């Protein structure tokens, strides 16, 4: 026990000092950053180190242990975008992702360009000076907020696509945040014609029809930082950060909903009503890959098709009917380049697979869990995890990030639609308890939404812990015990 605690403190001290792990020597099983604003991260499992890639346009957010949008990671808001902007339209986005991000880390952060206005410059005043302990907005319509504890500030950001609501002191949909009223702009006259075929050339441009051939380029002129529609009933949206426009793609089968500013099911998007959408073909039950070396696949059960995603860094094997590492997937071996094909298929999952731990495919450790269940998909509590039972064979798959599996509709949907989710209007899925048999994913997990007890899963073994300090509870997002006053769910 003392050894595990000591290793945990060593890992936290290493991260706090700015020294990043390059291997798993003396490191606990888990996820680790390998640098600032990096699109890759390190996974440690049984002492074995693996470098995993985030989906396209995302970087690793170490406090939340997920791949996240750059503007959601404190200190990375302006990095990597300036050089991409200078390289020109069309190929500019693609080159910005390669050399742009690298140069952003080398020079962008150091010079403080973009919105990095003096972070870490030593000139900032203490924002908690004279404030009582509690949560505060960073100002206006923003995803950023901070906690003041004993005159010390801790800066956080809401998970995409939520914004901080001062009135309720929690993250909420943008449409419900008073400070954001009047900032939701839907321009039906210009944004619908030939949007962004040139802009999207570096990111999944296959989803765009290409009409306009780049003559119209989305712009953030006159718009505050945030998310905006990019057309009517389209599978992409516009993000504005520091005046720079980017077209982002929704996960497979989802359409951007301008009313709540999230990627949503077409049935819930008012603009799509009356428009024909192709129904997925699902003649036989089973699991079917989206293509060569892909992290996305379709689960067919009782004639219904459900789009699923492998955990981060894994690909779906049609032959083995499971998610696995690239070198164990035949489709990836046949591809010409494992690295490039991995990133290409990773784009399909969008923000959907960022929070997964990257451990191998998640076959359940309890083979008897499907004995009393029918063949099909079953929810594992209020979580993105899905239990698959097929003739006694057990697998665990995942819904996209921020979604949970709804057993009534048999789709991945928002938490408030699931009977197993008791907390409404929250995406703090990492804090929900997991079922006792499911210890296939290595890491630290809370025993409840506001609990002083937590447990560690390592190689299928479960170890229980209790926070030592009075009023301390375990935060799954921070992977450590924190004061209960700093967690919104404890208020």
Curated annotation (Swiss-Prot):
Pfam families: CBM_14. Residues 1-18 form the signal peptide. Disulfide bonds join 54-67, 158-171, 250-263, 310-323, 399-412, 467-481. Keywords: Cell cycle, Cell division, Chitin-binding, Developmental protein, Disulfide bond, Glycoprotein, Proteoglycan, Repeat, Signal. It comes from the Eukaryota. Residues 21-78, 125-182, 217-274, 279-334, 367-423, 436-491 form the Chitin-binding type-2 domain. Residues 80-126, 187-217, 336-367 are annotated as: Disordered. One of its GO terms (cellular component) is extracellular region. This is Chondroitin proteoglycan 2. It comes from Caenorhabditis briggsae. The lineage of its organism: Eukaryota, Metazoa, Ecdysozoa, Nematoda, Chromadorea.
